[in-house]
């Protein structure tokens, strides 16, 4: 999972993620927006979940982050998982609306994002 951090002309941090993980970048850009307290909450949840069967979720305005002890899923809130309503041959997975990655990989991006933001 590759990523890049940039600052736009106004100094706002933007995240770009590799193909298949774009939604994780959107989550940082739309939900985190340099809010390090939110990252603290996510890291605390990851520590609590490690080695357990529980899961944790944080719904935002545009995206929801879901996590268990092994995996992180970020999905657009407009994406509905209504299996009975799916048309035959249609797949709910849309790389513009859903990304999955391992918890450790995600936490590496969180730590790198925090470092980048604090470099002001």
From Swiss-Prot:
Q: Which domain of life is it from?
A: Bacteria
Annotated InterPro entries: UPF0231
The Swiss-Prot or TrEMBL record describes its family as follows: Belongs to the UPF0231 family.
Name-wise, this protein is UPF0231 protein YacL
């Amino acid at each position: 999972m590759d990523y890049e951090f940039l600052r736009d002309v106004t100094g706002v941090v933007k995240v770009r993620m590799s193909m298949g993980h774009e939604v994780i970048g959107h989550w940082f850009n739309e939900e985190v927006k340099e809010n390090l307290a939110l990252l603290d909450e996510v890291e605390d949840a990851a520590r609590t979940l490690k080695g357990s069967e529980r899961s944790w979720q944080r719904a935002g305005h545009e995206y929801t982050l879901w996590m268990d002890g092994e995996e992180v899923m970020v999905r657009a809130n407009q994406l509905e998982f209504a299996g009975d309503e799916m048309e035959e041959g249609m797949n709910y997975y849309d790389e513009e609306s859903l990304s999955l990655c391992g918890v450790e990989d995600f936490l590496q991006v969180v730590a790198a994002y925090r470092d980048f933001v604090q470099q002001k």
